[in-house]
Amino acid sequence: MKSNRIFISWLRWPLFIRIGVIILCLILLFGQIIYILEPKQFTSVFEGIWWAVVTVSTVGYGDYVPHTPLGQAAGILLILSGASFVTAYFATLSAAAFSRQHRYIEGKVAYKGRDHIILIGWNEKTNRLLKDLQLAAPSKTVVLIDESLTEGPLIENVHFIRGHAADDGTLKRANITEAESVMITADQYKSETDADMLSVLTLLSVKGLNPLAYCIVEILTDRFVTNAERAGANQIIGTSEFISRAMLQHYQVKLRPSKQQNGIKLTLDQHVELLAVPDELKGAAYKTCVLYFLDHNTTIIGIQKKEGPMLSPPLTYKVLETDQFLAI
């Protein structure tokens, strides 16, 4: 029974370690044997071990050569037995390296770093965001979580994890407990309602594992904004509201053409500007401020407070004198 347990324990070792142990035993054994068979040619056990290493690796320097039939027979036996194990050893290492690389591309390798950004969902917005993050923080590692991709994008400083973002196992493989920030994008393959439900569920899973993570979540419908706030979102991006304002701005530009506007192409890439609160808007509701600036061909996307930016605040929010408008 004891020998059986030892054999089972031996089989549990990784294959390349077992082969390496066998090769080491062969080298030590034949180094001792050749020293005993030809003491004149091999004056020490170390010289025998050196000869065994050179022989088993099929290098064959020729500095030590057995002269007796017994020594030559030992050399033949070592080549036949040892060379096969050495070949199997390096083949196993190569296969293990290839397998790990393949598992890395498929998103099956866990991330071990810390202070990273977790980006959930793969779409054109995410692709653009990754490029912008590389420009803004080139040394920051981004862990991409997505279930639809079979292979991760080969982008520098991007570690791909394949799996459902709301699953604890997937988040743990992304090392969520050590993450600095989490960005959750809406699932493009679901309806708006289902996508928002999944985003809130993912947010709950993230906050449950790392309450200190700074979470930015994309919400498509207004009715899920409150749920996202309750789930602990630090910032909520209302895509529908942002797009509607931008389209309205484009429409107003069309209605009010001017010589300076001819030939100008407006995009969503405009730089965000900070605007002071006009005297007539101090204490006014955020909705009133939005309409005021729309009349002046300016789109407001949020409020810059002393504590930090607040994107898409409630329409009933009262603007303070110390606030600033985030405008594009």
Swiss-Prot record:
InterPro entries: K_chnl_dom, NAD(P)-bd_dom_sf, RCK_N, Trk_Ktr_HKT_K-transport. It is found in: Cell membrane. The keyword NAD does not apply. Pfam families: Ion_trans_2, TrkA_N. GO terms for molecular function: potassium channel activity. Its main location: membrane. GO terms for cellular component: plasma membrane. The chain crosses the membrane at residues 19-39, 42-62, 73-93. SUPFAM superfamilies: NAD(P)-binding Rossmann-fold domains, Voltage-gated potassium channels. It comes from the Bacteria. Residues 114-238 form the RCK N-terminal domain. Keywords: Cell membrane, Ion channel, Ion transport, Membrane, Potassium, Potassium channel, Potassium transport, Transmembrane, Transmembrane helix, Transport. It is a multi-pass membrane protein. This is Putative potassium channel protein YugO. It comes from Bacillus subtilis (strain 168). The lineage of its organism: Bacteria, Bacillati, Bacillota, Bacilli, Bacillales. The gene is yugO.
